[in-house]
Curated annotation (Swiss-Prot):
InterPro entries per the UniProt record, alphabetical: Mog1/PsbP_a/b/a-sand, PsbP_C
Keyword Cytoplasm set for record: no
Protein name: Oxygen-evolving enhancer protein 2, chloroplastic
GO molecular function: calcium ion binding
Subcellular location: Plastid, Chloroplast thylakoid membrane
Gene3D superfamilies referenced in this protein's UniProt entry, alphabetically: Mog1/PsbP, alpha/beta/alpha sandwich
Gene: PSBP
Organism for this UniProt entry: Fritillaria agrestis
Record keywords, A-Z: Chloroplast, Membrane, Photosynthesis, Photosystem II, Plastid, Thylakoid, Transit peptide
Lineage of origin: Eukaryota, Viridiplantae, Streptophyta, Embryophyta, Tracheophyta
Family: Belongs to the PsbP family.
Boundaries of the annotated transit peptide in chain numbering: 1-78
Keyword Membrane appears in the UniProt entry: yes
């Protein structure tokens, strides 16, 4: 680091070199102006080292600031009851496991176990809840002469041809009209929701049904059915849960499982 020093120089008066003088002329000295001279001086090594250290610290500060501005920080979002994702990494959904069958795919709740029980004709898959077998999912594949699911008619008409999917009650016989059931009837089914999406060029029927039986202790069962036709086969995925568990979280697993059902 350089510094400057200034010096003020004074010049002595000067007189003409001639020796001839006349009495009528007075000697007037010639005065030159003072000069201010500034000379650059090199500071000591200590100043240089201090300057170098300051420069390095300044460069490092600028570098860190630039890196912070240029870095994209993902928000640490978290839902209630979940840990914050402080590093911005994508979280893996561990609630479901992918399953690939013969010509179809779906997601199955991770805590459900495979079951050997065969409940429906053409059943190729069954998983059930570890703690409540009422909550389960099954896939059936049966031959059909239909070219499309729409050949069965409306979703309601299709459901009437596969009403065995809704289960059977333990009692049958003459009954009085009570508990909301018709006379001589111990079971009832109500269609709650119907949709007809097209996925991968294939028409699907998605039907949500609530059934109640006189011998049931769950207050009813929620059934969600997804069905389609391809290559001369009728594919049906049905998941269900008891009414009590439905409102305690089972709804998420039942609906997500049937929604994920996809036929190749």
């Amino acid at each position: 680091m350089a510094s400057s020093a200034c010096f003020l120089l004074h010049h002595a008066p000067s007189t003409p070199a001639t020796t001839s003088r006349t009495p009528s002329h007075r000697l007037v000295p010639t005065i030159k102006p003072s000069q201010l001279i500034c000379r650059a001086q090199k500071s000591s090594d200590t100043d240089e080292n201090s300057s170098t250290a300051v420069s390095r610290r300044l460069a490092l500060t600028i570098l860190i600031g630039s890196a912070a501005v240029g870095t994209k920080i993902a928000p640490a979002n978290a839902a209630y009851g979940e840990a914050a994702n402080v590093f911005g990494k994508a979280k893996t959904n561990t609630d479901f496991l992918p399953y690939t069958g013969d010509g179809f795919n779906l997601l199955i709740p991770a805590k459900w176990n495979p079951s050997k029980e065969v409940e429906f004709p053409g059943q190729v898959l069954r998983y059930e809840d570890n703690f409540d077998v009422t909550s389960n999912v099954s896939v059936t594949v049966t031959p059909t002469s239909k070219k499309s699911i729409t050949d069965y008619g409306t979703p309601e008409e299709f459901l009437s041809t596969v009403d065995y999917l809704l289960g059977k009650q333990a009692y049958s016989g003459k009954t009085a009209s009570e508990g909301g059931f018709d006379p001589d009837s111990v079971a009832t089914a109500n269609i709650l929701e119907v949709s007809t999406p097209v996925v991968g060029g294939k028409q699907y029927y998605n039907i949500s049904v609530l059934t109640r039986t006189a011998d049931g202790d769950e207050g009813g069962k929620h059934h969600v059915i997804s069905a389609t036709v391809t290559d001369g086969k009728l594919y049906i995925c049905k998941a269900q849960a008891g009414d009590k568990r439905w409102f305690k979280g089972a709804k998420k697993f039942v609906e997500s499982t049937t929604t994920s059902f996809n036929v190749a």
